[in-house]
Amino acid sequence: MTRDKRILFIGGSPCSGKSTVAERISKEYGACYFKVDDFLDEFTKIAAGKGKPICKQVVKMTSDEIWMRDPNLQCDEEILIYEEISDLVFEKLEQTDSDFIVTEGAAYTPDIMRNYSYQEYISIVPSAEFQVSHYKKREWVPYILEGCADKQKAFDNWMERDILFAQRIKAKCDEYSIPCIVNDGTRSIDELYKTVKEMFILE
C-alpha cells in the first residue's frame, strides 16, 4: 500500500465506541472516514466467490445456522472471516482518494495488522456489561436476528461471541504491546475521544 497516506486505524470489538471516535476525528481534522462495516457483506461475498472456505460457508447459512451454534465456534469463525477478507479491505483503502484517512472496524485484528506493519493502530474493546447494554439499544438488532426461531437464545449467543472476541483482541494487544482501551462506560465520549487523540498525537 502507498505509504504517503496517513491512515489512523481503530480496531477492537463491536459496540465499543470506535465509530463515534472515528466520526469525530473525521469532522475535526478533515480525515476521510473509512468504515469497514459498510463493506463487510460485499467483501464476504467476493471472498466466497474466490473460494475462501469460511466466507463460502457463511454466505449459504440461515440465521439459525449462524446464531444457534457454540459462541466459541462463532468467534473462531469471525476471526477467520476477517483474515479471508483482509486483502480486500486494504485494496479498498488503497483506492480511497485521500492522503489522510481514519478507518475503523473489528476486521483490524492485531494479527492482521502485524502482517501489514502499520504503526498508527489502536484498539477499543467494551466491557461485557457495556457491550450488552448498548447492543440492546441498537435499532437494527431485530433485523440481524430475523429468521431465528429462538431470538433470545440467538441474541445471547451473539453477545457471548462478541464478549469472547473482545477478550481475544485484548489478549493479543497485550501480547503485542498494542494500545488497547477498555470502554466500560465510566468515561464520557469526550474523555474517550481525548484519549484516542493523544494516542494518535493529534493536536
Descriptions of predicted regions:
Residues 1-5:
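Phosphate-binding P-loop
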Residues 10:
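Hydrophobic anchor at the beta1->P-loop junction of P-loop NTPases
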Residues 15-16:
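ATP-binding Walker
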Residues 19:
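Walker A/P-loop
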Residues 31-47:
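Short beta-strand-centered segment that lines the nucleotide-binding/catalytic pocket of NTP-utilizing
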Residues 42-100:
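ATP-dependent small-molecule kinase phosphotransfer cores
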Residues 120-165:
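A glycine- and Lys/Arg-enriched "phosphate-lid" helix/loop adjacent to the NTP-binding pocket
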Residues 164-203:
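NTP-dependent small-molecule kinase module
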